[in-house]
Amino acid sequence: MGSLSSSDYSKKPHAVCIPYPAQGHINPMLKLAKLLHYKGFHITFVNTEFNHKRLLKSRGSDSLKGLHSFQFKTIPDGLPPSDVDATQDIPSLCESTTTHCLVPFKQLLQKLNDTSSSEVPPVSCVVSDAVMSFTISAAQELDIPEVLFWTPSACGVLGYMHYAQLIDKGLTPLKDASYFSNGFLDQVLDWIPGMEGIRLRDLPTFLRTTNPDEYMIKFILQETERSKKASAIVLNTFQELESEVIDSLSTLLPPIYPIGPLQILQNQVDDESLKVLGSNLWKEEPECLEWLDTKDPNSVVYVNFGSITVMTNDQLIEFAWGLANSKQNFLWIIRPDLISGESSILGEEFVEETKERGLIASWCHQEQVINHPAIGGFLTHNGWNSTIESISSGVPMICWPFFAEQQTNCRFCCNKWGIGMEINSDVKRDEVESLVKELMVGEKGKEMKKKALEWKNIAEVTTTKPDGSSYSNLEKLIKVLKSKPSH
């Protein structure tokens, strides 16, 4: 620890960081934890036992040893044991964490605070994923601040915050299955401040149910209500990108600190020891970057549908031939569990047709890939991490949202920010081909690239300049984490 004596060390602030146990939530929480560590906090990072095992498998047995001042701990997720190397079922996971995780989390805090056996400073704050809000009662018992990190976009969170009103207005649950396709979802909602022109179909998709007892709706109502009890709310976005939405959210929630894009903030952390701490649950394939090194600038479409999206083999084949027929270079990440219930088979004809210009891999280091000069566009599911990383890199998008608030992100990318084109959910190869060509060599693609670079520039200013909004919000957040909560 360098020059810190043990008595000085025990006075360090100690943040316990606990992400929701899915890839897209672990990544941003680890970035935030590294930033806090860099700012002088001792960190305890809490994974579930299931994901801890997956990380050891993907990153090697030494990968979670951590540092003296950055430790990894685990709690059970309450689900039956499984060795499957795939994303867990989201509704089951939400129900299980809500029901089973509070007791082991409290026991962990107790152990960390046990002066007879613990060699770490007492826990002084909790930074929890907003959908792990059971942690609030543990923080209240210890009388320490609890900050909730909503990992979606601000526009996605604003959608969730209006679920109660959607129910009150009879807009969800849907009356019957015909409402999925009869135009009902196309109605414009003019009563959500900060979301002008938003349609029902653009809001997070859990409302698209005919089941009056839909668990995910109950879960969202519970989590959005509990968010009001936090000391503060953190978002991985920036004021300039979502100003109207953030202003609207500020009337509904405790103080909000947009501190994104986190990856640009984290790039300023000059600490080699932290760089070895990674969070990819699948093994990264370094040959992706080697292959990109052989390609011209802005000549490759990066294709990745994230860690949760699944598709049918027919959809996979339509995407494949759309990419092949576009004659553009592509790097396509196909997770082992991307095709629901079966393995993906693309066939020799496709491989032969694209061997000079296509590379398929099972996972990669996305930030390095998307920042590579060869990448000219991104075919994405519009998960928020992918979207904000694309914005930070100045890369325009083709959007194929799958679920949750990905629809909302797609709407804002295409209609508000000018950096995306949506592809029909019922994907056809001709549309894939024409959109990929437009993205890479068309006029609209050029306009979107220009706009994406403008957003990249704003994102860099807001995170790197002392008067930038995200830079100063991080400083304000640290003050909250070091303060005593006001009840």
From Swiss-Prot:
Binding site for an anthocyanidin: H25, A404
Classification via InterPro entries: UDP_glucos_trans
Family matches, as CDD domains: GT1_Gtf-like (cd03784)
Claim: Transferase is one of the keywords in the record: yes
GO MF terms held by the record: quercetin 3-O-glucosyltransferase activity; quercetin 7-O-glucosyltransferase activity; UDP-glucosyltransferase activity
Source superkingdom: Eukaryota
Known EC number: 2.4.1.324
Catalytic reaction equation(s): 7-deoxyloganetin + UDP-alpha-D-glucose = 7-deoxyloganin + UDP + H(+)
Active-site residues, Swiss-Prot/TrEMBL: H25, D129
Expressing tissues: Expressed in roots.
SUPFAM superfamilies in the cross-refs: UDP-Glycosyltransferase/glycogen phosphorylase
Keyword tags: Transferase
A biological-process GO annotation: (-)-secologanin biosynthetic process
Claim: NAD is one of the keywords in the record: no
Binding, UDP-alpha-D-glucose: T151, Q366, H381, W384, N385, S386, E389, E405, Q406
Function summary: Iridoid glucosyltransferase acting exclusively on 7-deoxyloganetin. No activity with 7-deoxyloganetic acid.
Family to which this protein belongs: Belongs to the UDP-glycosyltransferase family.
Protein name: 7-deoxyloganetin glucosyltransferase
Taxonomic source organism: Catharanthus roseus
Annotated gene: UGT85A23
